[in-house]
Curated annotation (Swiss-Prot):
Binds 1 zinc ion per subunit. This is Large ribosomal subunit protein bL31. One of its GO terms (molecular function) is rRNA binding. Zn(2+) binds at residues 16, 18, 37, 40. InterPro entries: Ribosomal_bL28/bL31-like_sf, Ribosomal_bL31, Ribosomal_bL31_A, Ribosomal_bL31_sf. Transmembrane segments: none annotated. Binds the 23S rRNA. Keywords: Metal-binding, Ribonucleoprotein, Ribosomal protein, RNA-binding, rRNA-binding, Zinc. Pfam families: Ribosomal_L31. Belongs to the bacterial ribosomal protein bL31 family. Type A subfamily. GO terms for biological process: translation. NCBIfam families: L31 (TIGR00105), PRK00019.1 (NF000612), PRK00528.1 (NF001809).
Amino acid sequence: MKADIHPNYVEIEATCSCGNVIKTRSTLGKNISIDVCSECHPFYTGKQKVLDTGGRIDRFKQRFGVFGSK
């Protein structure tokens, strides 16, 4: 590796909107603010909402189901 061409890699704090503080390293060089983290994201907390896409299938069968029956 060449000397003096690489960016400075320092420790920063990423502060979430829920109040959680994560210490990490970055070349940005300043603390950042994030919207979601693993403490408040629905995927990690288990409070994930499941979207119902079955309505589209039912609507299709309702419109075109007549053509399938003889």
